[in-house]
Amino acid sequence: MRRKTEIYSVELNGTKDVKPADQRDDKKFKGAKNKDLEPNKSHEKEELKKELDLDDHRLSNTELEQKYGTNIIQGLSSVRATELLARDGPNTLTPPKQTPEIIKFLKQMVGGFSILLWIGAALCWIAFVIQYVNNSASLDNVYLGAILVLVVILTGIFAYYQEAKSTNIMASFSKMIPQQALVIRDAEKKVISAEQLVVGDVVEIKGGDQIPADIRLVFSQGCKVDNSSLTGESEPQARSTEFTHENPLETKNIGFYSTTCLEGTATGIVINTGDRTIIGRIASLASGVGSEKTPIAIEIEHFVHIVAGVAVSIDIIFFITAVCMKYYVLDAIIFLISIIVANVPEGLLATVTVTLSLTAKRMAKKNCLVKNLEAVETLGSTSIICSDKTGTLTQNRMTVAHLWFDNQIFVADTSENQTKQAFDQSSGTWASLSKIITLCNRAEFRPGQESVPIMKRTVVGDASETALLKFSEVILGDVMGIRKRNHKVAEIPFNSTNKFQLSIHETEDPNNKRFLVVMKGAPERILEKCSTIMINGQEQPLDKSSADSFHTAYMELGGLGERVLGFCHLYLPAEQFPQSYIFDVDSVNFPTSNFCFVGLLSMIDPPRSTVPDAVSKCRSAGIKVIMVTGDHPITAKAIAKSVGIISANNETVEDIAKRRNIAVEQVNKREAKAAVVTGMELKDMTPEQLDELLTNYQEIVFARTSPQQKLIIVEGCQRQDAIVAVTGDGVNDSPALKKADIGIAMGIAGSDAAKNAADMVLLDDNFASIVTGVEEGRLIFDNLKKTIAYTLTKNIAELCPFLIYIVAGLPLPIGTITILFIDLGTDIIPSIALAYEKAESDIMNRKPRHKKKDRLVNTQLAIYSYLHIGLMQALGGFLVYFTVYAQQGFWPTSLINLRVAWETDDINDLEDSYGQEWTRYQRKYLEWTGSTAFFVAIMIQQIADLIIRKTRRNSIFQQGLFRNKVIWVGIASQVIVALILSYGLGSVPALSFTMLRVQYWFVAVPHAILIWVYDEMRKLFIRLYPGSWWDKNMYY
């Protein structure tokens, strides 16, 4: 058994000793950012992926002072601070090494097919030099070499521009770093640059400040922090000096670098700076995690290897053949150039890029902003989605979900746009409860929002108070008016010790001048303060039966993963508390017991209304959705069930144990079809156990997980050969976003670091947008197959003329430059047009493609394109070629082995089949005519090829011949380019085109019709005999 995966077992500053700072070995810390501290990068990455192992949260203040050689009152001396700054370096994050832009550009110049074209260009210039030396130089090879270089440079620039994406992850982390810090040094308070902070410094923070380093709190007063970017917790977290948890990420006496203090004040000792802070470690981890190659990049690389392999193989075979047939080496080199150009689809990679760009634009309109174009298809290949809960699956706002009063549970409306609540509001108990909810609340709407819908108004207050305020406003209206009429005279804010909030109000009833005390807080604490309970508007003694009803409701609501609050009130006797009475909240000169319990209210961050349907679509599409959250397991499970990540009929081990009333250990784990796994459980798992979990359970929720555990979950999924999509919004998500096959950041709630690490940004933070992206991704894969099949088909029609030219010695049927006009002229727009083709069937009802089995270019596609349709096109081209020559007097048989005489400049009396003599110029003109006719023949047949590529299985009549209008724009572009080349540029000798007789345009039409009929028969038999030999070998 391998050792257990320690998730983030990090040594503080590289050492686990707790010596005073003065006694530690400074050599270990000098130049902490130098390479000599990174002898093994893979080892360092593994260290980064381990759980934080600190003990500072366990130490007393005295031990802390001793460990760091500091004093809570006086702080460090300036001299010592200078020494530590020189030793540890500034409190900043080290930027990663960047690949120079010129290197990125040069990679585009030699990637893909470019290297073959460079070879072709080099051979052109070599041929020219040889000809020049032999005094027979022709500028044709110079022109061709220049054109090939131009093609490489232009496609390289295009690819560089289109594929450039943000890799500056560290820069976004740096934006989060606080600029100034209030520090105590030499017994004086000083404002210094945060970069100058050192371990042992004593710093003070207040509401609104960013914490300038990892600190251990030694004083706190009402301090709350926002840790959401690090831990995923959406609720403000209280901070105190108490050691409350073994895990340093969850204890209350540690504050983390770059998190925000929301309210209160605190003083702390700096325990980590710069790269050694939690955010520093995450930044290093994100930068150190290598971006995985996207599936489409792997497919294109695979395709390039196939085409390059075919080109090189044919080159070698025919070079040897040419030499064996006594051709000059120079001629053999020229053959090589032609075969390279004929084999390489020069415009294809640019076409793929444009196709991906068009899809990316479509997705942007559907709120998916694609940063990395290849991610467009990756999303369609996704087989596992690891999704955050807060903000992605949920609405990212606390909302009132249930109420309990009069011994009944009422369901509240949790939809995004609440306009009213449907539960019974006629009871007197509800009147009292609604008053407490309204008055015992410090949240307020920002002014000037009267015309804004209530649920979209901006509120000053925390998440829970905001939910209660909006709930009250929807039902009662004019909450601020109610508060004015019930003036607040005293208040005890909520704190973690009391666990309640209390306020005292004058009442608006002119006949009742008693003060009203309202209280809300933890239900069990509120119940302790009550002696009566309100039922149907009447106070009754709080007996055992009522208490039991309370506990039943409390457990039921808590079991739904909702945050439950209790509410009670007390009218103060007018004779003891007259209108002139001065309330003192410090001495508490008023009653805090014998209240009347009114009811319970529970809140939750509810699911988005579109998510359940989106999850259902994922399941139909064979995609496993895994929830990974930092939230509580009960809450996570409740949301997972409500959105369908855990199906209604599927049980976890805990559910089975509860149903059978037995211990969890007694349940056979294989009986459960769903699993809820906590971060602590994951920490104790070996990689093999994680693999087993991911394999055996289709429905999984990971709760209370750390960011590093999220990365390990992603790696576990990838070990299953899954293509993994990960959503995230916080700094903590950056490593997992970068490691995933496709990282998806939140556009609204997402941090800069998350957006930079991701490949895609959801502009509306909505999980349903991912499913839309999956559909687009699957469609683009299908359409790319069609595009490649279309592009490859003509390669055989371009290659065969050179092979016949070499073997049979015919006059050259088509020139190299003419081929480039096909690849980069007539075929570009039609290739792109296929990106607009609609799906043939419901692509969301099939399983994700297997990244090793379902290839973009498979054997069936290559055989059908090359050997079926490709050979038909070649035959059609030769039919036109021989027709042109026959009409001019050269029968096909007379052309065999005529090449040498045909190309000899000194022969000006070459006889045709009728005895007519041809000069060298006349023969050259006829050669250009034959080449132009061959070009037109390929173009005509490519029109048929374009139409049949609209579908792979359905008849084009089922798909709709005119459904994709862009196809017809592509066809029109082919004809227009051919007309311009033939009739517009036909007089330019270097281009080898001539003005073609009208009848030659129609010679290849029967072949085009044959191609269409043949393909319709192929599709018919595939539909008639699914699963047959024909289906397996003829469907690509």
Swiss-Prot record:
Residues in compartment: Cytoplasmic: 1-99, 165-300, 351-784, 836-855, 951-964, 1020-1036
Amino acid composition bias (Basic and acidic residues), ranges on this chain: 14-50
SUPFAM superfamilies documented for this protein: Calcium ATPase, transduction domain A, Calcium ATPase, transmembrane domain M, HAD-like, Metal cation-transporting ATPase, ATP-binding domain N
Regulation: Up-regulated by K(+) ions in a dose-dependent way.
UniProt GO BP: intracellular potassium ion homeostasis; intracellular sodium ion homeostasis; potassium ion homeostasis; potassium ion import across plasma membrane; proton transmembrane transport; regulation of pH; response to metal ion; sodium ion export across plasma membrane
Region Disordered, residue ranges: 1-50
List of residues that carry Phosphoserine: S955
Catalytically driven reaction(s): K(+)(out) + ATP + H2O + H(+)(in) = K(+)(in) + ADP + phosphate + 2 H(+)(out); K(+)(out) + Na(+)(in) + ATP + H2O = K(+)(in) + Na(+)(out) + ADP + phosphate + H(+)
GO cellular component: apical plasma membrane; basolateral plasma membrane; plasma membrane
Residue spans crossing the bilayer: 100-120, 144-164, 301-320, 333-350, 785-804, 815-835, 856-878, 931-950, 965-983, 999-1019
Binding, Mg(2+): D729, D733
Keywords: ATP-binding, Cell membrane, Hydrogen ion transport, Ion transport, Magnesium, Membrane, Metal-binding, Nucleotide-binding, Phosphoprotein, Potassium, Potassium transport, Sodium, Sodium transport, Translocase, Transmembrane, Transmembrane helix, Transport
Membrane topology: Multi-pass membrane protein
GO molecular function terms listed in the Swiss-Prot or TrEMBL record: ATP binding; ATP hydrolysis activity; metal ion binding; P-type potassium:proton transporter activity; P-type sodium:potassium-exchanging transporter activity
Main location: membrane
Subcellular location as annotated: Apical cell membrane
Active site: D388
Bridged cysteine pairs (disulfide): none
Entry keyword annotation includes Membrane: yes
InterPro entries referenced in this protein's UniProt entry, alphabetically: ATPase_P-typ_cation-transptr_C, ATPase_P-typ_cation-transptr_N, ATPase_P-typ_cyto_dom_N, ATPase_P-typ_P_site, ATPase_P-typ_TM_dom_sf, ATPase_P-typ_transduc_dom_A_sf, Cation_transp_ATPase_P-type, HAD-like_sf
Enzyme Commission number(s) from the entry: 7.2.2.19, 7.2.2.13
Role played: The catalytic subunit of a H(+)/K(+) ATPase and/or Na(+)/K(+) ATPase pump which transports K(+) ions in exchange for Na(+) and/or H(+) ions across the apical membrane of epithelial cells. Uses ATP as an energy source to pump K(+) ions into the cell while transporting Na(+) and/or H(+) ions to the extracellular compartment. Involved in the maintenance of electrolyte homeostasis through K(+) ion absorption in kidney and colon. In the airway epithelium, may play a primary role in mucus acidification regulating its viscosity and clearance.
Family to which this protein belongs: Belongs to the cation transport ATPase (P-type) (TC 3.A.3) family. Type IIC subfamily.
Entry-linked PANTHER family: POTASSIUM-TRANSPORTING ATPASE ALPHA CHAIN 2, SODIUM/POTASSIUM-TRANSPORTING ATPASE SUBUNIT ALPHA
Protein's UniProt name: Potassium-transporting ATPase alpha chain 2
UniProt organism field: Rattus norvegicus
